[in-house]
Each structure stands twice: as structure tokens, then as C-alpha cells.
Swiss-Prot record:
Organism from which the protein derives: Escherichia coli O17:K52:H18 (strain UMN026 / ExPEC)
Keywords: ATP-binding, GTP-binding, Nucleotide-binding, Nucleotidyltransferase, Transferase
Family statement drawn from the similarity comment of this UniProt entry: Belongs to the TRAFAC class translation factor GTPase superfamily. Classic translation factor GTPase family. CysN/NodQ subfamily.
NCBIfam families (UniProt xref): CysN, PRK05124.1, small_GTP
GO biological process: hydrogen sulfide biosynthetic process; sulfate assimilation
Catalytically driven reaction(s): sulfate + ATP + H(+) = adenosine 5'-phosphosulfate + diphosphate
Region (G2): 92-96
Protein name as it appears in the record: Sulfate adenylyltransferase subunit 1
Entry keyword annotation includes NAD: no
Assembly description: Heterodimer composed of CysD, the smaller subunit, and CysN.
Length: 475
């Protein structure tokens, strides 16, 4: 058994008291990212090891695995704690996103270990989409690399405001303060171009040796700041969705018998209470909240992030994908939007193409009207392109087949985040963050139907020798 866990349970006075204490601890979701071989998996392994979150049988298995697959010689290869796929162990890299849970006396944590290779950027974006803080690892020998910049930009694009720059492998540069200072200045120069008001902190460490991870390093007396664990335990996270207006996307209509009809989902933002007047979009029909049903029984109110079932006083037509909000809020449905896109498919994104779109439980179709620009990761400049390649990041104009209720992603990730789905293979090919919904008054009318634009794109792609012109022209 985990001796640290057993001690915590004993200190709390039993399992039940310990579980109650866990419920009242704050939860921090964070990810580790950065370039390949910067030590992301090793850092997580070190955190788990030094906070005594590893069971004795896991530690014994780790010793055996280190002998077979380890890359650290005679030392424990802590990366094997999170690199679970056979291909990951054989190559010594991370491919998939690995999630791990651990807790200390002050906080609970969910870690997403993301891959560093460029071809797995899509996996990194997936891991970052649910996190509140990013640990960006930099190899002290290499400094700031392209993937460091790419992952920094993607993290901020996905709404992460807290960045911890962990300058790793300090043991390989003799724990040099000069190296730490140089990399710190290089990153700050780059970070000045990142969007948003960011909280950036720097920690010099060695994940392999444990310096400044969970305990202060004796090898770096020149550093008097907090350890990485202290930063994670004390950082204050301001959840944007708590202060935003109520948004409740309906995920499921619960009708177990003739006497009950409820609308299940997760409250995306704000709060809702019994008796509140709500409006259903896109229909615009209004009703009152009669009950708030949860697994633990009825509640008088609920808050952002809670899974609930709402029962209304009136039997009205509500289906999956509809949105409930406060009745006094005017939120118009839109049919166009500018969207920040992280493209994840080998086939590039081009104007004129159509995709299935899924957003907040609703599935519809969207046409790409044009690509405004692609972001150059090296210097964050914008350049005009005809298509968006694999791992490309850019701003795209979309037109939807039906009116949708959208928020800007930075205000509400649930009603502002979407995925692109290939209509033939049903594969997710891109992730989108609503930059700005376009009202009907400002949307430019199209003289061509969606079918005509899609057929035109198909002909130009597969029969270029026909010389068909682009119906979208310079868009």
C-alpha cells in the first residue's frame, strides 16, 4: 500500500473523514508540454515519486521496467510511470496524452502529459483544452525551440493564463545561473508577443535528480524562489466561467417514465436556481426552472461545471444541442463566425470545403469561406496562405448551415469551442475556438449555395486540368 496515503488517512481519522477532506480541496488541472526529450514524462514521474504517490508494487515494477526499457542507465527511469504504450517505451517518447492524478495536503491535481513531437501537436492541443495551467519544459542545453513557441501559443489560444516555464536538465549545464538567466530572457522576449494578460513564472530544475521539483535544490543556492510543487500548490486560478452569464447546453433529454421529463447536461457557465426564468435557444421559448436534479438529490441552485438535470414548469420542445440561458439575456443566433483553428489532418484545410461541426452537444455543417491568415510560430507574425497544413494554426471564416448560439472561446470554452469532422471518414480533423461571432447584419451575403461551393472545391481539387475558377475569388 502507498505509505504516504495510509499516513494521510490515519491523520484524518479514517477513510470516511479523509474522503470528505478530499472533496473540499481545490482541484488544479495542468499539462506538461514542450519540445521532444525535454523531460516532460520524467518530471511527472518525479512529482509522483517525491510526493509518495507510487504504490510499492508500482515501484517494484518500475525497477524491472527501467532495466528493460530505461534510458537513464542505472537510475530509475521515472518517465515509464506515464509512458504506458508499448511504442512509447520502445522509442522512449510520449505519443498519446497520459492523465495522472495525485494530491497533496493542500490541493488535488490532474496532470496531462502531452507529446513533444511536431506530428503529435494535435494530441497536445487535446490535452491543453481542459487545463488551467501549463508547465512548459525547456532543455537547459538547447534553449527555446520551435515546439516551445508552438506549445506556448496553443496554450494561450486555448485560454490558459498561467504558464510555468520549467528550465530542466540544469544538472547537465553545471547548475549555471547564467544559462537560466539567458533562457529566461529569451523566453520573455518571445512571450511579449503572446495574446492576453499572462502569469509567467520560471523554475530551474532537474527532473532526473529531483532539484527544485518537490524540495529545494542544494546545487542552486543562487535560486531563492519556490519549488515547482510550491508553485502548483499556491497558484490562484480565476475561473472565467464562474463570472459569465448562465449557459446550459442540453446533452440528453431524460424521459425514464411518463411522469418525468428532464434535460441533462453540464452547466457551462454562471449559476442557475429553482424558480429562475430561462429561455431556450434557438427557439426563444421561455419557461421556469421547477427542479434541479443531481445524483445526490434535488438542489436549490447549481454552479458552473456541475452535472445536473433541469426540470421545467412547461412541457416545451427541447432537444439535444439546444441552449438554455437567462430569459432576460439577449443573445442572437449567428450563421457566421471567425474561428481560430488548429488543423490536425494530412489533407490541408482550404476555402470552399465543408465539414461537420460539433459544438456544445450540437452537430451541424459548416463551409470554409476563407482563410484570413496562418500564424508563423517562430515570430507569431501573420501571413496569407491558400490552405492550412497539418499542425497549422490560423484564423478562418466559417458559415454554418443553420443559426447557432456562440460565445467567444476566451469567454466560454464550451459554447465557443468546436471540432471539425470529416464527413466521409467521421475523423476529427481540426479544433476551433470562436474568435468572433458575426451577426447577420455584418455577414456578407453569398451568391452561391453551399452545394455549388462544395462542388466547385471538389472539381478544383480532383480535376485541376479542367481549369475551374474558384467561386470564392479572393476570399
Amino acid at each position: 500500500m502507498n505509505t504516504a496515503l495510509a499516513q494521510q488517512i490515519a491523520n484524518e481519522g479514517g477513510v470516511e473523514a479523509w474522503m470528505i477532506a478530499q472533496q473540499h480541496k481545490s482541484l488544479l488541472r495542468f499539462l506538461t508540454c514542450g519540445s521532444v526529450d525535454d523531460g516532460k514524462s520524467t518530471l511527472i514521474g518525479r512529482l509522483l515519486h517525491d510526493t509518495r504517490q507510487i504504490y510499492e508494487d508500482q515501484l517494484s515494477s518500475l525497477h524491472n521496467d527501467s532495466k528493460r526499457h530505461g534510458t537513464q542507465g542505472e537510475k530509475l527511469d521515472l518517465a515509464l510511470l506515464v509512458d504506458g504504450l508499448q511504442a512509447e517505451r520502445e522509442q522512449g517518447i510520449t505519443i498519446d496524452v497520459a492523465y495522472r492524478y495525485f494530491s497533496t495536503e493542500k490541493r488535488k491535481f490532474i496532470i496531462a502529459d502531452t507529446p513533444g513531437h511536431e506530428q503529435y501537436t494535435r494530441n497536445m492541443a487535446t490535452g491543453a483544452s481542459t487545463c488551467e495551467l501549463a508547465i512548459l519544459l525547456i532543455d537547459a542545453r538547447k534553449g527555446v525551440l520551435d515546439q516551445t513557441r508552438r506549445h506556448s501559443f496553443i496554450s494561450t489560444l486555448l485560454g490558459i493564463k498561467h504558464l510555468v516555464v520549467a528550465i530542466n536538465k540544469m544538472d547537465l549545464v553545471g547548475y549555471s545561473e547564467e544559462t537560466f538567466t539567458r533562457i529566461r530572457e529569451d523566453y520573455l522576449t518571445f512571450a511579449g508577443q503572446l495574446p492576453g494578460n499572462l502569469d509567467i513564472r520560471f523554475v530551474p530544475l532537474s527532473a532526473l535528480e529531483g532539484d527544485n521539483v518537490a524540495s529545494q535544490s542544494e546545487s542552486m543556492p543562487w535560486y531563492s524562489g519556490p519549488t515547482l510543487l510550491e508553485v502548483l500548490e499556491t497558484v490562484e486560478i480565476q475561473r472565467v466561467v464562474d463570472a459569465q452569464p448562465m449557459r446550459f447546453p442540453v446533452q440528453y433529454v431524460n424521459r425514464p417514465n411518463l411522469d418525468f421529463r428532464g434535460y441533462a447536461g453540464t452547466l457551462a457557465s454562471g449559476r442557475v436556481e429553482v424558480g429562475q426564468r430561462v429561455k431556450v435557444l434557438p427557439s426563444g421559448v421561455e419557461s421556469n426552472v421547477a427542479r434541479i436534479v443531481t445524483f445526490d438529490g434535488d438542489r436549490e441552485e447549481a454552479f458552473a461545471g456541475e452535472a445536473i438535470t433541469l426540470v421545467l414548469t412547461d412541457e416545451i420542445d427541447i432537444s439535444r444541442g439546444d441552449l438554455l440561458l437567462a430569459a432576460d439575456e439577449a443573445l442572437p443566433a449567428v450563421q457566421s463566425a471567425s474561428v481560430d483553428v488548429v488543423w490536425m489532418a494530412e489533407q490541408p484545410l482550404s476555402a470552399g470545403q465543408s465539414y461537420d461541426i460539433k459544438i456544445a452537444g450540437k452537430k451541424t455543417r459548416a463551409r470554409v469561406d476563407g482563410i484570413r491568415y496562418q500564424v508563423d510560430i517562430n515570430n507569431l507574425t501573420q501571413r496569407e496562405v491558400e490552405n492550412l497544413p497539418l499542425n497549422g494554426i490560423g484564423l478562418v471564416d466559417l458559415t454554418f448551415d443553420e443559426p447557432l448560439v456562440l460565445d467567444r472561446y476566451q469567454q466560454n470554452p464550451v459554447t465557443g469551442g468546436l471540432i471539425f469532422i470529416d464527413r466521409l471518414s467521421n475523423v476529427t480533423v481540426g479544433a476551433g475556438m470562436v474568435h468572433e461571432p458575426v451577426s447577420q447584419a455584418t455577414a456578407a451575403p453569398s451568391e452561391f449555395s453551399a452545394f455549388e461551393l462544395e462542388l466547385n472545391a471538389l472539381v478544383r481539387r480532383h480535376f485541376p486540368h479542367w481549369g475551374a475558377r474558384d467561386l470564392l475569388g479572393d476570399k
